[in-house]
């Protein structure tokens, strides 16, 4: 729950029961069984209190015979969707950084290098690499349902005719898939240039991998005018405010390296701000790093 009047809180989750050997019944009255207990695991989270503003001059509207304020209003939803997608990706990068630093990289399969020379097939996206990443979840791998990748990686798979399109339930949209995983193509996915090569990071997502919520905002949107702006021509400013949470389940956001009230994109990607609290198999995320 979110702390009252604050932007931090905790998510409580009961741990799996495990598979201890059962008791075996007998006819001895004094031989009593000992009950097991279920433990609770807590994850800390931090909301992002965000805002953005856009201004338009009255004269520009009068000369163009168009309504820029209306155009802005119609695009605000897309702006926040894109912004929150970037925050989600940066959170995943922070989770990966923590995993490599503190959990032996047991969620990552990497074949990427920064070697000089041509990229080899073994260093590119391929079925073997994806399946090895899937295997980091062991017998829980069936939870994985989607893979997010940069458009460069998606195009390489297209060139090999490995993207299979499946119609949605209504038959109106063809959904791209690879190895049965729904493909999410996004150029916000990391493409980090080294001295010789680019390393691309892909993410396998499972159902329930990300928790999402919205906090209370006193004034989600507002407008104000400055009649003196433009030498008296007038200016209108539109303000939009949100309080959002996108949190990878199985990790606590420690806020160890957060300077302000909300974590920036750069702070979300820091290993120091994340700590895994669930067993690896219970976290439906896996990471892949390739050169092409």
List PLM regions with ranges.
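Short, low-complexity, charged/polar segments at coil/turn and helix-coil boundaries
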Residues: 1-7, 13-20, 121-155, 179, ...
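Assembly/oligomerization interface modules of large self-assembling protein complexes
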Residues: 1-50
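Generic structural "secondary-structure junction" signal
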Residues: 4, 47-49, 56, 61, ...
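Long, contiguous amphipathic alpha-helices that act as assembly "spine/axial" helices in icosahedral shell
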Residues: 11, 39-103, 139-148, 183, ...
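Short, low-complexity, polar/charged sequence segments that are solvent-exposed and flexible
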Residues: 29-33, 64, 72-75, 165-168, ...
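Glycine-rich loops and low-complexity Gly/Arg-rich segments
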Residues: 34-39, 70-72, 78-81, 170-175, ...
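Alpha-helical scaffold segments that mediate packing/assembly in large oligomeric complexes
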Residues: 59-137, 267-269, 274-281, 287, ...
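Sequence/fold signature of self-assembling virion shell proteins
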Residues: 115-128, 132, 152, 158-292
């Amino acid at each position: 729950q979110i702390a009252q009047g604050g932007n931090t809180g905790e998510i409580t989750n009961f741990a799996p029961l495990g598979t201890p050997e059962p008791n075996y019944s007998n006819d001895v009255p004094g031989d009593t069984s000992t009950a097991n207990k279920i433990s609770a695991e807590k994850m800390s989270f931090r909301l992002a209190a965000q805002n953005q503003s856009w201004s338009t001059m009255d004269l520009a509207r009068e000369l163009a015979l168009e309504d820029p304020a209306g155009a802005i209003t119609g695009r605000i939803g897309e702006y926040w969707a894109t912004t929150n997608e970037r925050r989600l990706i940066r959170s995943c990068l922070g989770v990966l950084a923590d995993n490599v630093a503190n959990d032996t990289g047991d969620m990552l399969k990497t074949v990427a290098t920064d070697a000089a020379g041509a990229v080899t097939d073994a260093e590119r996206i391929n079925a073997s690499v994806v399946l090895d990443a899937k295997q980091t979840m062991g017998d829980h791998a069936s939870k994985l349902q989607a893979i997010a990748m940069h458009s460069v990686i998606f195009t390489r798979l297209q060139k090999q005719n490995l993207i299979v399109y499946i119609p949605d339930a209504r038959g109106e949209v063809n959904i791209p898939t690879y190895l049965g995983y729904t493909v999410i193509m996004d150029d916000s996915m990391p493409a980090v240039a080294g001295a010789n090569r680019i390393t691309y990071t892909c993410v396998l997502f499972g159902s329930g991998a990300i928790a999402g919520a919205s906090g209370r905002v006193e004034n989600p949107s507002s407008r104000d005018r400055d009649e003196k702006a433009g030498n008296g021509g007038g200016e209108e400013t539109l303000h939009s405010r949100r309080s959002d949470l996108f949190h990878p389940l199985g990790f606590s956001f420690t806020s160890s390296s957060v300077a302000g009230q909300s974590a920036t994109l750069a702070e979300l990607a820091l290993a120091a701000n994340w700590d895994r609290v669930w067993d690896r198999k219970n976290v439906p995320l896996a990471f892949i790093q390739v050169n092409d």
